[in-house]
């Protein structure tokens, strides 16, 4: 079984919606939480968020993974300055321009039910490097979880990805803001 990763503007929007499913957090959020802020993503306007995502898909801001032709995974990737939540976050110990559009950010993964634990997120994390570089990024960064060995994670925490997936792809840890979170970066 081969996992392929493509920029989202090279696949059907229906593939993204298949990955998100009809219910649950991904279907409700439409990957707008980091773009709109947490309160706005919980409004009842799912259709409005879906249309925002459609526009981002046209711009190529994201990746889709297929397993033997079946859509199985999504990863949000765009200039860091596109994410309102990241611009509003306090960055203790980091002194850089949050609006620098040459730094791209990976904020969210969705793996379709029935296809988890098969390397989908790892393939997507690795795929962000070429896509960001091709779009003119100077670097790509992510904010993954680093759960303690043998410890359970709370439902939904891993939507930002696992630290190990990014390290395996060649990202370097640049900051550790908490015991369970790292900031990783791949410089071009």
List each language-model region with its residue ranges.
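Conserved acyl-donor/pantetheine-binding loop and adjacent beta-alpha core of acyl/acetyltransferases
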Residues: 66, 71-116, 150-160, 167
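Conserved acetyl-CoA-binding loop-helix of GNAT-fold acetyltransferases
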Residues: 106-111, 117-134
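Active-site beta-strand termini and strand-to-loop segments that position acidic
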Residues: 66-68, 185-188
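Conserved N-terminal entry element of GNAT/NAT acetyltransferase domains
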Residues: 1-39
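Conserved hydrophobic beta-strand within the GNAT/NAT acetyltransferase core sheet
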Residues: 106, 140-142
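Conserved active-site alpha-helix within GNAT-family acetyltransferase domains
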Residues: 133-138, 146-176
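A short helix-loop-beta-strand connector motif used in the catalytic cores of GNAT acetyltransferases and
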Residues: 41, 47-64, 81-87, 105
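Short hydrophobic/aromatic beta-strand or adjacent loop that forms the aromatic wall/cage
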Residues: 60, 179-184
């Amino acid at each position: 079984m081969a996992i392929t990763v493509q920029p989202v503007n090279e696949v059907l929007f229906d593939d993204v919606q298949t990955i998100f499913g009809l219910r649950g957090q991904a279907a409700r959020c439409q990957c707008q939480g980091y773009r709109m802020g947490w309160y706005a993503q919980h409004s009842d306007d799912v259709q409005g968020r879906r249309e925002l995502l459609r526009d981002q898909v046209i711009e190529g801001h994201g990746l889709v993974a297929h397993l033997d032709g079946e859509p199985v995974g999504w990863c949000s990737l765009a200039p860091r300055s596109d994410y309102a939540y990241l611009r509003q976050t306090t960055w203790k110990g980091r002194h850089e321009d949050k609006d620098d559009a040459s730094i791209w950010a990976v904020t969210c993964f969705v793996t379709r039910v029935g296809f988890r634990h098969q390397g989908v997120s790892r393939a997507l994390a690795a795929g962000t490097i070429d896509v960001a570089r091709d779009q003119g990024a100077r670097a790509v960064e992510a904010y993954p979880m680093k759960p303690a060995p043998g410890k359970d994670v709370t439902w939904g925490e891993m939507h930002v990805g696992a630290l190990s997936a990014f390290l395996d792809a060649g990202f370097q840890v640049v900051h550790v803001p908490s015991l369970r979170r790292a900031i990783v970066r791949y410089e071009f």
